[in-house]
């Protein structure tokens, strides 16, 4: 059977092991073909090909439900559930999503882009099934990295106390999440994998039996059952922690042996309560470059399949904000040994891998545990350290209570660097950093800021570390503006002070963070047709520079706010509230992300869809204030009518 003919996972039923291995080979080839051309997650999916086929062979996917944790390991799932033909559109606007979406396929039973949610969701489905008297299987597939998340452990604790609720949890143990996982649980799993008796059983004994002349290289079912019995006798402590929590534990088993996994899953389905099947896989399996560099090939931009090297950019790009942050933090850590960088399993993405290599003693990775990262930093700040916590904007949402309760209320000097703030592109709605402006501005005692470029980022980082209180600094994904950077000697900025970056008398734009360069470009568009626009780089969300904004707003009489974040409760709302509290009724337009989710696309496509390109914003400003111009604005017809504004 060719993979293109496989439109329903139930077509796997009855295929021989040889046929399934042929399908596995085709899945890897298609996976590599598409990701090498368009980019996407590579290593996670390559590691679960056999696991997916073996699991789905034992299920009726017209009834049974599988919840994949995070979703970036589910590319093989997509390829055998009717998306082979459309897979070329992976992570492209209007195409196949990089994560699971309930609206994309009836086989995507639960959407996810954040880690550690699968067991809770699958358990919820199992409880709903039992309460309605229905009969179908509920399965969660979770990686060992995601298992370090507190939510996953909470779900295991709950499921273990429901002995009559059938639930299968498949632990995909590849000793990796995005970076190598950390903590006692990871160490425990590693001990289980490397247990000498288990290695002996899985390796030497099996190889000896296969090599017997009358075996023909095959292991008969009777000896497989004997091997499993010997495994349990020889390694009695394997899985003890899960069994103490109420699960029936099976494994560890080879995650690339379809026959062994199929037998184990069939046995697991016969158990009447929660079962944990521990499957050991190799991230990047089948592609040597991905096997050799499991961190680098977790996710890739387009690359040359034969060399494994990224395709060169058509035009050179400045260093990313994340890289500038990481390099600057190293310098500041060298100057002050009390500064410590903290990440939640995202060292490479946030730039903290630079600190990890340079000053490992001033670097901490807590694993996928954002709540713990925040309160850990609070405790460190209590006793004299200056923690800098670098977390993606979308992931810091998971620790909102800790931001308030453990840091904000106690006025502790912790710095949060919110990476990937704003539009992120192809990862879609689960990863857009569109909410942090709204949630951070609501927390008392925080000073919240965003730089207009990478040079201002450096000064803001110094400002944060000099400030005796909690601070938050948001930075966008992607390259900086290409401005000159200082190697050291950065000066702190005055707290709560913005700056005028362009003079004008017709309209005032107050822009926040990454929208400042777009505001300048918008002003240039309007200047070309005779409208002179003043631009303020706000710098601060909390506290606002009212002393600068209010007089200019009164003098000019028309004000526009620009932010790369949700309009609801965002920067524009802060400015509007500030004006109203002072009784200043000034005509106003708020520009930002309206009340909608932003789907996967390139950042530029997202900006266009949201009406956030300079020419579109120039048209909106002209139309909103009924401005007279000396000429026509270009691309006027492209200004999207659906993007809301507030006056």
From Swiss-Prot:
GO cellular component: cytosol
Role: Catalyzes the acyloin condensation reaction between C atoms 2 and 3 of pyruvate and glyceraldehyde 3-phosphate to yield 1-deoxy-D-xylulose-5-phosphate (DXP).
Subunit structure: Homodimer.
Pathway the protein contributes to: Metabolic intermediate biosynthesis; 1-deoxy-D-xylulose 5-phosphate biosynthesis; 1-deoxy-D-xylulose 5-phosphate from D-glyceraldehyde 3-phosphate and pyruvate: step 1/1
HAMAP family found in the cross-reference section: DXP_synth
GO molecular function, one term: 1-deoxy-D-xylulose-5-phosphate synthase activity
Key words, A-Z: Isoprene biosynthesis, Magnesium, Metal-binding, Thiamine biosynthesis, Thiamine pyrophosphate, Transferase
Organism listed in the record: Synechococcus sp. (strain CC9311)
Reactions the enzyme catalyzes: D-glyceraldehyde 3-phosphate + pyruvate + H(+) = 1-deoxy-D-xylulose 5-phosphate + CO2
Protein name: 1-deoxy-D-xylulose-5-phosphate synthase
EC code: 2.2.1.7
Binding residues annotated for Mg(2+), in chain numbering: 144, 174
Family per similarity comment: Belongs to the transketolase family. DXPS subfamily.
Protein origin, superkingdom: Bacteria
Binding site for thiamine diphosphate: 72, 113-115, 145-146, 174, 287, 370
PANTHER family from the UniProt entry: 1-D-DEOXYXYLULOSE 5-PHOSPHATE SYNTHASE-RELATED, 1-DEOXY-D-XYLULOSE-5-PHOSPHATE SYNTHASE, CHLOROPLASTIC
Cofactor note as given: Binds 1 Mg(2+) ion per subunit. Binds 1 thiamine pyrophosphate per subunit.
Swiss-Prot/TrEMBL cofactor(s): Mg(2+); thiamine diphosphate
Database matches in CDD domains: TPP_DXS (cd02007), TPP_PYR_DXS_TK_like (cd07033)
NCBIfam families linked: dxs, PRK05444.2-2
Top-level EC class as recorded in UniProt: transferase
One of the GO biological process terms: isopentenyl diphosphate biosynthetic process, methylerythritol 4-phosphate pathway
